[in-house]
Amino acid sequence: MIITSERISLKHLLTAEALTDREVMGLIRRAGEFKQGAKWHPEERQYFATNLFFENSTRTHKSFEVAEKKLGLEVIEFEASRSSVQKGETLYDTVLTMSAIGVDVAVIRHGKENYYDELIQSKTIQCSIINGGDGSGQHPTQCLLDLMTIYEEFGGFEGLKVAIVGDITHSRVAKSNMQLLNRLGAEIYFSGPEEWYDHQFDVYGQYVPLDEIVEKVDVMMLLRVQHERHDGKESFSKEGYHLEYGLTNERATRLQKHAIIMHPAPVNRDVELADELVESLQSRIVAQMSNGVFMRMAILEAILHGKA
C-alpha cells in the first residue's frame, strides 16, 4: 500500500538545518512513496534541470540525473571542462546563463563554502538552487537520504544512538547529519582523530574514543578521509588509521545485532572500514545509494511544486 504524504514545497535547498521537521519528514515519506512505485510527471509545461558539478562526483551527480529522468524532466548537460568556465566565466554568470535560457532548477556542487549566497540574492536569477555540496560546508541531499535509510530501519530517530566517525571537520556530510539528527532526538557520538574534530560540534553530541561506543550504537556512520582537503598533511598511514579509527572486522563483531553500518561513499576500503564489511548484512551503504535516487526525486518534486 502506498501511503499518501503531505506535499512539500521548497524554493531552494541549501542547508539541512534550514528545513523544518515537517519538511524533513514529508520528504522522507514522499521518497518512500517513490520507492514503492509512485509516479509524478510534470503537467501543463516542460521543466528543465541542469547539474553543475565543479567537483568530482559519481553518486550525487548520477543519482540526480536518474531522479530527473524518472520525473520526466529535460536534463541540460553541463561539463565544466568543456564550458566557458575554461574561459574564466564565474559560477554566477554560468547560473545566470542557465536561468536566462529557461532552466528551472540547478543542482550545484562547488568547492567554495556558501557559494549559493550570491545566487539566491540575485534579482535576475530565477532558477531554484539545490546544493549538491559546498566545500566543507553542507550536503543536505546526502543527509536526507541518510535519514531516509535510518528511518526505514528504525521507524524514527528519538533516542537512537548514532556514532559519526572519521574526518569530521572536513565533512559536509557530518555537519548536515549532526544538525538534523540532534534536532530529531538522536543521541550523537563523535569519534576519530581528535585533530580532525572541532569542539564547536559539542553542541550536537560528545566526542568519545571509538572503542567506548562500538557496543552501544544503533548506527555506525563512517566518513571518508578527505585527502584532497588535507593538503597532503595527514599524519596517519592507511593501515594505522584503520587500526586506530576504522571499523575493523574485530570491532564489527562487537556491534549490536540490530546496528547498521553507513558511509556516504566513496569508501576507502580497509581504511574507514574493512573491505568485507562494505556489503555485509549490517551494511546499508548500497541502500543509501539506492535511496539517493528516491530522495532526490522527492526534493526535485518539492522544488517544482513550489514553482507550480
Swiss-Prot record:
InterPro entries in alphabetical order: Asp/Orn_carbamoyltranf_P-bd, Asp/Orn_carbamoylTrfase, Asp/Orn_carbamoylTrfase_sf, Asp_carbamoyltransf, Asp_carbamoyltransf_Asp/Orn-bd
Enzyme kind, highest EC tier: transferase
GO cellular component: cytosol
Source organism of the structure: Enterococcus faecalis (strain ATCC 700802 / V583)
Binding site for carbamoyl phosphate: R59, T60, R109, H139, Q142, A265, P266
Catalytic activity: carbamoyl phosphate + L-aspartate = N-carbamoyl-L-aspartate + phosphate + H(+)
Name by which UniProt lists this protein: Aspartate carbamoyltransferase catalytic subunit
S-S bonds: none
UniProt record, GO biological process: 'de novo' pyrimidine nucleobase biosynthetic process; 'de novo' UMP biosynthetic process; amino acid metabolic process
Gene that this polypeptide is encoded by: pyrB
Subunit and interaction comment: Heterododecamer (2C3:3R2) of six catalytic PyrB chains organized as two trimers (C3), and six regulatory PyrI chains organized as three dimers (R2).
